[in-house]
Structure formats: C-alpha cells, structure tokens
C-alpha cells in the first residue's frame, strides 16, 4: 500500500490495542477507512493493512487519544532505517520504529517522544527520529572504507544476515572474498525468494 498517497488528508479516528504487541489504527477521509495493523512481537515485527477490522467489545484499550481526529499531513520513511513516520497537521507524529525485539511506536510532539506503545522501552523516550537517518554507501568503495566496522556501518542488516555470512565463510575470507559474499547477500535481499 502506498501510504503517502492514501493517508494525507485523512483523520485518525481510532487507535487501540486488543493484544499486548498489536496496535490498530483507523484513518478516515470522510468516505472510507484505511487500517494499519502494527504487530510488534519480537519474532516478527510487521505492518499489515486489512480492508476492515472488527474491534472486540472486551479486552480493548484506546491509545494515543490526543491524536484522535487529527489530520495526517504526510507519511515518510527514515533513510536507511526500518522506520515510518506519520505526520499530523499539529506538529505531532507517530513514529513506527520497526527494530526487531526493540520495535515500538512513539508519539512525537515537535520531534520529541512523549508517549510509547511499548511502555517498558523507556529509553525510547530519549530518542529522536533524525538520529536514525543516515546515508549508507553500498558500493565496493564504501565497503572497503569501513573495513572491520561493517556491522556498525551497515546497521540495517540484522543478525540473520551476519549469521548467514558467517555460515558462508565470512570469518576466514579476505576482503575481496568478503566483498563478493556481501554483494551476493545484497542481491538476495533485493530479489528475495519466498514461499507461502
């Protein structure tokens, strides 16, 4: 779903949770609703976009109520990060920080976190989305310039990627061989095969 073409101009009409690691958001443009279901369990964090959603009458809690009926002004991604920001007309925003077991949704007021979906991640109250924006050079030159610091430089690659590289002989490889392995992994990530 192309959120930047869908959500601007819509109002947030409900934000609630029925499960510990799940947030449902409903946006409406006066004609139809658009739903975002944010699932944040550590084993698989993802966003899905159901066509409709029936809210349970029990075990449901309203969240981010200060944003209700506020109009969306923009949707943006943070460069080289697994994050999405939904901006509202009143200088507030919802930041979807999709970082594996550290995933969270933060209510921002003037770029500063003021409320959290996963309250136990209190360090998120000190974070700013601009600190996560970065330009990463994926070229061979960038790779060689960051020799020995690859895990810190290529922050968007998580543990399974580095584990795969290790299984393919990363530790024993020289820099040229590592570059070939790295390039191969990038190709796999950009053109994935998956089965349902």
Task: Put a short name on every predicted segment.
Residues 19-21, 79-80:
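Residue-level recognition of beta-strand termini and adjacent short loop/turns
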Residues 14-17, 76-77:
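Short beta-strand
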Residues 24:
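Non-catalytic, usually N-terminal nucleic-acid engagement modules in DNA/RNA processing proteins
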Residues 6-8, 18, 66-69:
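Flexible, charged surface loops at secondary-structure boundaries
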Residues 29-196:
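Phosphate/anion-contacting hairpin/loop surfaces
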Residues 1-14:
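Extreme N-terminus nucleophile/cap motif
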């Amino acid at each position: 779903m192309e959120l930047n073409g869908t959500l601007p101009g819509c109002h947030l009409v409900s934000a609630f949770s029925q499960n510990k690691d799940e947030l449902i958001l409903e946006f409406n443009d006066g004609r139809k609703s658009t739903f975002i279901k944010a699932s944040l369990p550590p084993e698989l964090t993802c966003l899905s976009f159901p066509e409709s959603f029936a809210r349970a009458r029990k075990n449901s809690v309203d969240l981010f109520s200060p944003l209700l009926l506020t109009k969306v002004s923009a949707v943006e991604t943070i460069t080289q990060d697994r994050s999405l920001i939904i901006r509202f007309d009143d200088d507030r925003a919802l930041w979807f920080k999709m970082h594996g077991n550290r995933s969270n949704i933060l209510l921002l007021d003037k770029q500063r976190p003021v409320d959290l979906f996963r309250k136990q991640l209190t360090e998120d109250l000190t974070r700013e989305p601009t600190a996560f924006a970065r330009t990463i050079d994926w070229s061979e030159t960038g790779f060689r310039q960051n020799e020995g610091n690859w895990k810190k430089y290529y922050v968007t690659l998580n543990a399974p990627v580095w584990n795969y590289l290790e299984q393919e002989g990363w530790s024993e490889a020289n820099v040229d061989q590592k570059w070939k392995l790295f390039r191969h992994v990038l190709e796999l990530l950009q053109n994935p095969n998956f089965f349902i």
